[in-house]
Amino acid sequence: MITKEAAQKIAKLARLKFEEDTVEKFFTQLSTIMDMIDILNEIDCKDIEPLTSVCNMNARMREDAVTSSDLSSELFDNVSGNSTQLAKEVKYFITPKVVE
């Protein structure tokens, strides 16, 4: 069981601000969550294998094939404006300054 003072400290640490009428609701909800966690902690699961996925399916594997993937010329064909040629040469997108 969690105390009301501990709930208020947790809210302060999380930088949560509550109106006076909602503090009691927060306290009740947090206490319920902590009680659920206590119930889960009581479960003996040392003989249970951890799940890697909720779906018990095998992934279809394929062989890796090396291919040419330099698509920069096609990518930079979409650049418009005065910086088209420079963008193709340096292989960067040139954008207006956004941070001063």
Swiss-Prot record:
Keyword Cytoplasm: no
Database matches in Pfam families: GatC
Keyword tags: ATP-binding, Ligase, Nucleotide-binding, Protein biosynthesis
GO molecular function: asparaginyl-tRNA synthase (glutamine-hydrolyzing) activity; ATP binding; glutaminyl-tRNA synthase (glutamine-hydrolyzing) activity
The keyword Methyltransferase is annotated on this UniProt entry: no
EC number annotated for this UniProt entry: 6.3.5.-
A GO biological-process term: translation
Function recorded in the entry: Allows the formation of correctly charged Asn-tRNA(Asn) or Gln-tRNA(Gln) through the transamidation of misacylated Asp-tRNA(Asn) or Glu-tRNA(Gln) in organisms which lack either or both of asparaginyl-tRNA or glutaminyl-tRNA synthetases. The reaction takes place in the presence of glutamine and ATP through an activated phospho-Asp-tRNA(Asn) or phospho-Glu-tRNA(Gln).
Family under the similarity heading: Belongs to the GatC family.
Subunit structure: Heterotrimer of A, B and C subunits.
Protein name in UniProt: Aspartyl/glutamyl-tRNA(Asn/Gln) amidotransferase subunit C
Taxonomic lineage: Bacteria, Pseudomonadati, Pseudomonadota, Alphaproteobacteria, Rickettsiales
